[in-house]
Amino acid sequence: MNRNIIIGFLAALLLASCGYPKKPEAAAPSPQGAGKDNLPLNAQLIGSTPIKNQGKSELCWAYGMLATIESEHIMKGDSVNLSVAYVARMMLQEKALEYYFAQGKKPISMRGMASMLIHYIDKYGAQPYDSYEDPKDVNYKILCRKVEKICDGAIAQKSGIEKLKDELNNLFDKEIGYMPAKQVHMLGAEYTPLEFAHSVCYPEEYVSLTSFTHHPYREYFALEVPDNAMHDQFLNLPLDELMLHVQKAVENGHPVCWEGDISEEGFTHAQDNYVEVQKIELPVTPASRQKEFEQLRTTDDHVMEIIGTFLKDKKRYFVCRNSWGKNWANQGRIYLSEDYLRLKTIAVFMSEAAFLYNQSPKDTPQKPYI
C-alpha cells in the first residue's frame, strides 16, 4: 500500500464518533498535524483544561460543552475540570429505563447536542474529573448493546425497575468505574453532585444560537436535526450577526462551543491544520448556507470548543480544541476558517455574559434558556 493511500485512509478516520453512522466510529491521529505546534504567534488563546480523548464514543457534545464551561471558569480565575464519564453513566441509566418502559422499542444511543449536557447536569449533577475519570478502554456503543440486553431480560421477566437498576449499576461499575463518594469535596467545601453542578453552571447561564432562513430572525425555534432529541430552542440570528457574536466572545476571553459539519474535504484533508471551504463555495451567503443545510450537505456531525482566533494573510481563523487526544492535528487543536464557520455551523453555545457583551438585553427576545 503506498504512502498516499495510507494517509487518505487515516484522514477518513478523522470523521469520528460524533458523525452519523455512515462515518467511522473512532478518531485517529491526523496525518496533517502529527501533534506538532504550528499555532501563529498572534493567536489569542483562552485558558483551557488538558485535551481529552473521547475514544470510541459519540460523546463529543458532552466533551465540547464541558470544556466550554471549564474555560469560562478559568477566565474568571477559577479552576474546574469536569467528568464526562459521570454524565455518560447518568444518561445511560435514564435511557435504559426509557428502553424498559418502551418495551425495547426505543433503541439506546449516546448521540446528542451540546445543549443536552446542560439538561443532564441540571438533573443529575456533576463530578470533578479527578473523582470520576474517563475510562480509557470503554466502547460505549458496545456498552449500549449490553444495557439493551439486560433490559430485554428485565422486560421478558417483568422484573421491575429496582432489580433492573441493580443490574445496571453492577454493569456500570465494571465498565465505567465505581461511583465516587456521594459528596463532592472542592476547595474545602462539600457539595452534593447537584449543588456542585449548579456552582459551575447554573441552568440559565448559557445561550444557544444559530442562523437559518427557513425561520424568522430573532425568534427561537427547535433545530431540525436528528440529535436534538430534547427539542431545544435556538435563537435565530442573521449570519453576519452570529459570526460577530462568536468573534467578540472569543476576543473578550469567553469560550464558544461549536457544533457543526466535519464531513467536508477541507476538514478531513486540512493542510497544516487550516480548514478551508472550496473556492466554488465562496462567497458564503445566508442563501448558500441554507442550501447546504436543506440539501443535507451540512449535518450535525461534531462538537468542539473554540478557544482562540487569529488573522493570517488577512483571513480570520478560529482555534478549536477537539476531544480526539493530543496526538491529533496541532496537539489536539485545529483552525477553522471564518468561511468554514459561516457555511458549516449548525449552532454555537456561549455564556450569557459573552452574548450580552456590548449588547443591551432589551435587544434580545425573552429566551427559553437551555
Predicted features along the sequence, with ranges:
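Bacterial signal peptide processing site
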Residues: G19-P21
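Second-shell loop/turn segments in exported
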Residues: I46-E58, F101-S109, A229-N236, H245-V246, ...
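Active-site signature of cysteine proteases
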Residues: D166-I370
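N-terminal regions that are enriched for targeting/export leaders
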Residues: K23-I46
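Positively charged n-region of N-terminal signal peptides that target proteins for export
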Residues: M1-N4
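C-terminal motif of bacterial Sec signal peptides marking the signal peptidase cleavage site
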Residues: L15-S17
